[in-house]
């Protein structure tokens, strides 16, 4: 029975990306108009059109530092854990379901967002933010943090850093990505090239998250 439930959950997850793509294509003009109406609003995190590109470049620099980080405390934990090989979006969602975590609509595949960006970069970044929030909530659950259901994504990010689940640099990078994606959600103009730069930055965090999934947290 448990296997049957797992399969049903998995099928529902696989259907999500196709549903989202259909909605974006079918109602792209309408959704874009909603974005356009918000352009005059003050953007969160102090991001304006003039500094949006600067934020992306700052995030790229932090991402390089995150990629070079060595975390010996996590290396010790991994030595005692069984390593699960994760290669595809199917593997990702299957593993998350096994660990009692919420699956990802995109299967954490960057190519999924690159495809969306070719239609509407802002919508793609909005979707990326959803996955980023899901990853952080799953990390909090994986590291057994007691998080209030009303906690904001920034509060969760801070709790993860204080617990040592993420490094200071990862914390900084997540905050930068939240600033960038929030600006996109609030209607700032984003080029496909800029969106793809952000996806490559996100790829670093996704890889770290995959590593956590592979050994199943502490």
State what each model feature region is.
Residues 19, 23, 116, 120-124, ...:
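Non-transmembrane, amphipathic alpha-helical segments
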Residues 140-170:
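Short, charged amphipathic alpha-helical segments flanked by flexible coils
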Residues 126-130, 134, 155, 197-201:
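Amphipathic alpha-helical interaction segments
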Residues 30, 134-139, 205, 209:
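Amphipathic alpha-helical segments in well-ordered regions
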Residues 171-176, 182-218:
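Charge-enriched, short contiguous segments at helix-coil
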Residues 37-128:
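Membrane-proximal, non-transmembrane interface segments of integral membrane proteins
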Residues 1-53, 57-61:
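Short hydrophobic membrane-inserting helices
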Residues 114, 120-147:
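Extracytoplasmic/periplasm-facing segments of secreted or lipoprotein envelope proteins
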């Amino acid at each position: 029975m448990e296997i049957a439930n797992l399969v049903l959950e998995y099928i529902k997850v696989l259907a999500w990306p196709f549903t989202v793509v259909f909605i974006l294509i079918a109602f792209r003009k309408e959704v874009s108009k909603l974005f356009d109406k918000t352009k005059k609003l003050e953007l969160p995190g102090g991001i304006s059109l003039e500094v949006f590109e600067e934020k992306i470049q700052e995030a790229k620099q932090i991402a390089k530092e995150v990629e070079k980080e060595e975390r010996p405390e996590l290396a010790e934990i991994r030595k005692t854990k069984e390593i699960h090989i994760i290669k595809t979006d199917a593997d990702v969602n299957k593993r998350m379901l096994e660990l009692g975590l919420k699956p990802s609509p995109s299967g954490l595949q960057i190519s999924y967002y690159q495809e969306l960006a070719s239609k509407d970069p802002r919508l793609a970044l909005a979707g990326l933010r959803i996955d980023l929030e899901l990853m952080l909530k799953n990390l909090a659950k994986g590291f057994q943090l007691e998080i209030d259901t009303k906690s904001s994504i920034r509060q969760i990010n801070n709790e993860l850093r204080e617990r040592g689940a993420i490094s200071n640099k990862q914390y900084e990078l997540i905050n930068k990505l939240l600033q960038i994606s929030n600006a996109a959600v609030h209607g700032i103009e984003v080029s496909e090239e800029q969106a793809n730069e952000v996806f490559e930055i996100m790829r670093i965090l996704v890889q770290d998250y995959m590593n956590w999934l592979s050994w199943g947290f502490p």
